[in-house]
Amino acid sequence: MPKGMCLKSDGFASNIYDPASDFTLHHFCAEKGIEYSDAGLPVRLDTFSAYGLAFKERKVPELEDKMVTCLERLPNGFRLGLDSGESFTARRVVLAVGITHFEHVPADLATLPPEFLTHSFRHHDLEPFRGRNVVVIGGGSSATDLAGLLHEVGADVQLISRRTALKFHGKPEVGKTRSLWQRIWRPQTGIGPGWRLRFCADAPMLFHHLPENLRLEAVRRILGPSGGWFAKDKVIGKVPLLLGCTVQRAEVENGRVRLHLRGLDGSTHDVRTEHVIAATGYKVDLNRLKFLSSEIRSQLKIVNGAPVLSSGFESSMPGLYFAGITAANSFGPVMRFAFGAGFAARTITRVVAKSVAKKSGSSSEPVRHELHEVKVPEPRQKAGAASGS
């Protein structure tokens, strides 16, 4: 993700979960002398990344940093293969693979060669785009953040979105006491204000018991594309916007990309650029997890690309659990955020501990565990695509 980017979540909602809650982002920033506020001060990506590494060293120093290349089913569990050639077995596996594998690029753009098209996730250093003409496609936080940062490094950037207007979060009112009526009417949560978000943030288990069609529709509609409040001033009035347009076709002509666009009124026109960045979000599709054996992928019960999960985050394959964005269809949009990790961790730990105790015949027997960082190979990409060259 781009250097200089900020998290959309507030400081109080950007903690990594641990039962004691004694090493929050606030604690980390205080130790390092980094400015912090529960709300109203954006959390920089580099600050959050440093916090994550410090959390690992302090809380789980025994975590193994290994690349998992295959996961196969066995009669009594699973076999995991590592890129080092090592392998080991486990009765239970929890997959929390994040968003890396689920980059979504619209079909009308996907035909472009990788030297002309990249996904926003692939970019960290934007300096290679200084002085170049770039088009960013999208209307959410990735698109607005990226467009603003590209403008700051000196790129000639334009933002194109099918939406007729960009949405931005409102800036939190820091230091101002909210009235009782305001707190009742629009309660604050770790993923935004309002009763719908309060339900999603505080009651993921109740969300899980909703009918499937309601859950899927809620995940699709709630928390739609919107930029962080801090990105608005970096984009509006500074980055040229082309709104209400969709890409009908994309092709390369004379070393530049030609985008064929259609407006809501049916009008058509073309835009030419050196490079296109698709800030078009992520779409869960377990078939993209190539380290999963074909047997596992074919036997998992899947709806809309995501695993169907029990109330304990267990998939239809006993012993295989999913957390993070892959659990959103089952437990709601809060699973996309660090704020939802606490619920997932507590639930999975309780279910696994109960299962182990049941098999051992004693609820008092301690649970033995091994920690392995679930690192999996990223989708292959041709050289030069990440740098935009």
Mark where each language-model region is.
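Flavin (FAD/FMN) cofactor-binding and adjacent substrate-gating region
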Residues: P2-I34, Q188-H208
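Flavin (primarily FAD) cofactor-binding/catalytic cores of flavoenzymes
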Residues: S37-S141, D145-S389
